[in-house]
Regions:
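Positively charged, polar, low-complexity stretches
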Residues: 1-83
Length: 83
């Protein structure tokens, strides 16, 4: 099954991470999208590690030199908030 692609190459840098996280947050557990970028999104990986530890998987599908494609999957859900 193919995942939808989120191509951020034409966005200004400050808009990229918020859009990527909104896209991730909208996923159900087990769903994924493919991020398409013009550079290695390794800093984004570290941001996911900090903000979504244990809730995502990260798989490089293509690694440059001009295009990077990364499959990002939601593998769990956030803990329930106390009422």
């Amino acid at each position: 099954m193919s995942q939808p692609e989120l191509d951020v190459r034409n966005l200004i840098p400050r808009e990229r991470h918020p859009l990527i996280f909104r896209t991730f947050d909208a996923l159900a557990a087990g769903e994924a999208f493919v991020l398409v970028n013009d550079h290695d999104p390794k800093p984004l990986y570290y941001q996911f590690q900090a903000e979504s530890t244990g809730r995502f998987s990260w798989e490089y599908l293509e690694q440059g030199p001009e295009v990077w494609r990364v499959k990002i999957e939601k593998v769990g859900s956030a803990p329930a908030k106390a009422q």
